[in-house]
Amino acid sequence: MRSPLLAPSEKCQAWPRFTPPWYLSSGLAMTLYTAFVANQRCLNSARTREPEYISQVMTGSQGVPLHVWRSPIPSQAKGTLIATYGITGSLEDQGFLRQWGRWAYERHYDVILFDWRAHGKTAELSPTLTSDGLYEGEDFVYLAAQAKALGYPGPFWFGGYSLGGQLSLWGVYKGQTLADWGNNDAMLTSFSPTDIGGAMAICPSLDSQRSLNYLTSHPVGRYLEKAIANKLKELAWQLHRHHPGEFDSQAIERANTIWGFDHNLVIDRLGLASVEDYYEVSSALPLLSKIVKPTLLLYAADDPMFHPAIVEELPGLQNQLTGVDLQITPKGGHVGYIANGPCQQASNDPDENWAIHRTLDWLDQKSLA
């Protein structure tokens, strides 16, 4: 009998079962393999088949410049995917995002990928730091409005994975509440919530406080946290070089953990008193019951980055979810979902990236509805 934890959402058809290679059967192994092997493989594959993106600077909320890659507009496009990545990285090095965009384009969706705040080339353009969705959610809406003005067809779908998944959840929420915050901005006057189709979030961060406490309480988790913190510190020094005088070098020196990065560099700029307050107000978990647009949330029960209690609680929220299609798999790791050969064949997928093809199947289903 199927476990209730793994029951498919009633809002979405049951998916083919995900099965990894035997050597990636643990969430930690899958996560490390994805970071050190699969990402580069995705990048190599995407470079040969992705659309010829046009690099452009668009405008986000608060006038923040955002670096984007936008695809040529294909004939008979089904809609437009606007997507970004996780806590660290850039458009140049995110293989999973590039493959997602490549396969979406092959399925006749327009694609806009972007470096979110304080990342990639966006970090060269602006000293504005991250807000974990509070303003990035609005950024998605601003990008969609500008894409519409350029001739990109709706509906507009917001996508992300890991922390980017949290951002996409904020994006769809901000999109459906546009009237509450748009303030008659001229850039948004020809855009409305009806232009937005929904969102897709793969292994999103839902409760940063609990997950960070969980990570730092285990030896392996501390290793993962330290690796991310080192990347964040590199990011801070890059911002310091690009924008002299904007950042206190001593504050950057003190930012030796994820919590330290947010404490020393982020919360004051957002007017928040503590990191705990920041994580509470930016958490995506309370948003799930408020989202009414079709939104896919794909989550692996063995994701080593998140507190295991979260995945145990999610099925209990089903009755509160009006727009969210919750899909929980027993395996998959953190943004891994590398399928073995039989799994790939059973799903008739063109490559091993199971999550990419399931999300696009879901998108096709919603586009036909």
Curated annotation (Swiss-Prot):
Q: Which UniProt keywords apply?
A: Hydrolase, Serine esterase
What GO MF annotations does this protein's record show? monoacylglycerol lipase activity; short-chain carboxylesterase activity
InterPro entries the record matches: AB_hydrolase_1 (IPR000073), AB_hydrolase_4_CS (IPR000952), AB_hydrolase_4_sf (IPR050960), AB_hydrolase_fold (IPR029058), ABHD4 (IPR012020)
GO BP annotations, alphabetical order: lipid metabolic process
Q: Gene3D superfamilies, per this entry?
A: alpha/beta hydrolase
Enzyme Commission number(s) = 3.1.1.-
**Which SUPFAM superfamilies does the record match to this protein?**
alpha/beta-Hydrolases (SSF53474)
Signal sequence region: none
One Pfam family here: Abhydrolase_6
Q: Which residues are the active-site ones?
A: S162 (charge relay system), D303 (charge relay system), H334 (charge relay system)
Please state which protein family the record places this protein in. Belongs to the AB hydrolase superfamily. AB hydrolase 4 family.
Q: What is this protein called?
A: Putative esterase slr0264
Which organism encodes this protein? Synechocystis sp. (strain ATCC 27184 / PCC 6803 / Kazusa)
